[in-house]
């Protein structure tokens, strides 16, 4: 077990979502300005709904997405579209992903926008795929080799050919990083998280001083 991994277990997905909101609220109360990286997928949807219900004003919070499918943010499979639809608030201070036909330019542009607007990466919430991927750092893909701090294009051929993903170096720089992994279908990968398996999630954990896994399994 990687020593820098903290594991918190709750009985249900709902309890995990409520605890995550409590933990992040404690962080938000400590800072005048705050940044939080959000993920797509179905796992964090309840947490986002609870967050939106608790906070009605976001002027001191800057949101960014840890990865994005290489599509316009009006497309149904866009992570930012999903997040914005849940918050249903035009005042949400989300650093917008601008689609360019060239995924490399899209990644470079988002890197510039995020690094210009965020001086300190306070929190990020990440899921973990069945194959151990985090953000869009999938096993056996080129993005795993990047040594830059920012975002890079990554060819994955899952739903879309390309993804734009935060790099290990950016995620390693986040002060408090939560792996939010729930559901019966995640039992197998949860057993591998924090062990010496050659998975992207474990490489990320190894790069950080502390990572928190929140799960119901």
Regions found by a protein language model. Give the residues of each.
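N-terminal glycine-/serine-/threonine-rich phosphate-binding loop
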Residues: 1-36
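Ligand-binding beta-strand-loop-alpha-helix segment within the catalytic cores
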Residues: 1-4, 58-125
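Glycine-rich N-terminal segment of FAD-binding domains in flavoprotein oxidoreductases
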Residues: 32-52
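Glycine-rich beta-strand-to-loop/alpha-helix junction loops that act as flexible
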Residues: 38-43, 126-130, 182
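A short secondary-structure junction signal
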Residues: 107, 135-140, 189-193
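Class I SAM-dependent methyltransferase SAM-binding "motif I" and its flanking Rossmann-like core
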Residues: 124-126, 130-169
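ATP/nucleoside-binding phosphotransfer catalytic cores, i.e., glycine-rich phosphate-binding loops
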Residues: 173-217
């Amino acid at each position: 077990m990687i020593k820098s991994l903290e594991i918190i277990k709750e009985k249900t997905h709902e309890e995990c979502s409520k605890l995550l909101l409590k933990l992040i609220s404690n962080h938000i109360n400590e800072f005048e300005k705050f940044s939080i990286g959000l993920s797509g997928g179905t796992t964090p949807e309840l947490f986002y709904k609870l967050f939106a219900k608790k906070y009605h004003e976001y002027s001191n919070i800057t949101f960014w997405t840890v990865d994005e499918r290489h599509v316009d943010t009006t497309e149904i499979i866009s992570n930012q579209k999903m997040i914005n639809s849940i918050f249903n608030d035009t005042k949400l201070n989300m650093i917008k992903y601008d689609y360019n036909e060239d995924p490399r330019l899209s990644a470079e542009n988002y890197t510039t926008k995020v690094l210009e607007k965020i001086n300190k990466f306070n929190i990020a919430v990440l899921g973990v795929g069945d194959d151990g991927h985090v953000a869009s750092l999938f096993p056996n893909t080129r993005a795993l080799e990047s040594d830059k701090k920012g975002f890079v294009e990554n060819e994955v051929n899952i739903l879309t050919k390309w993804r734009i993903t935060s790099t290990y170096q950016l995620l390693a720089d986040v002060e408090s990083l939560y792996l939010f992994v729930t559901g019966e279908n995640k039992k197998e990968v949860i057993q591998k998280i924090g062990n010496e398996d050659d998975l992207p999630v474990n490489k990320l954990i190894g790069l950080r001083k502390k990572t928190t896994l929140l799960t119901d399994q």
